[in-house]
Amino acid sequence: MLQELSRLNVADNTGAKIVGVIRNLGGSVKKTSNIGDIVVVSVKKAIPNGMLKEGQVVKALIVRSTYGLRRKNGTHIKFDDNAVVIIKEDGTPRGTRVFGPIAREIREKGYLKIASLAQEVL
């Protein structure tokens, strides 16, 4: 579960490395987000000459969470870090590569382009 002010790693090649959550989208009283949710983030650390600069505000999709996720078949899945993929307004990724594994729930929620770019779908 990720809340406002959480720091997240970026799992794509947009140039951002660390982002901070500004707002959880999906309702006025939504306090936390998990895998597959969209959040508004601010770029905290970025590489020089990258697509994104420090201080930019963008939308991102959560692809990994240390909190974990319970699936309908009873299994639990947890990751080693909290990570996001930066997306455009229409839900397509801004980068051209996605690093590390992502959860299968990303594909089930309709983000097929992100799932196809990922190295591994768990």
From Swiss-Prot:
SMART domains per the UniProt record, alphabetical: Ribosomal_L14
Query: What Gene Ontology terms describe where this protein resides (cellular component)?
Result: cytosolic large ribosomal subunit
The alphabetized UniProt keywords are:
Ribonucleoprotein, Ribosomal protein, RNA-binding, rRNA-binding
Q: Does the keyword rRNA-binding apply?
A: yes
Write down the InterPro entries for this protein, in alphabetical order.
Answer: Ribosomal_uL14, Ribosomal_uL14_bac-type, Ribosomal_uL14_CS, Ribosomal_uL14_sf
Residues crossing the lipid bilayer are none
Record keyword Ligase present: no
Q: Name one GO molecular function term.
A: large ribosomal subunit rRNA binding
| Record-level GO BP terms | translation
| Family affiliation | Belongs to the universal ribosomal protein uL14 family.
How it assembles, according to the record, is: Part of the 50S ribosomal subunit. Forms a cluster with proteins L3 and L19. In the 70S ribosome, L14 and L19 interact and together make contacts with the 16S rRNA in bridges B5 and B8.
User: What NCBIfam families has UniProt attached to this entry?
Assistant: rplN_bact
Give the protein's biological function. Binds to 23S rRNA. Forms part of two intersubunit bridges in the 70S ribosome.
Which protein are we looking at? Large ribosomal subunit protein uL14
Q: Which organism is it from?
A: Mesomycoplasma hyopneumoniae (strain 7448)
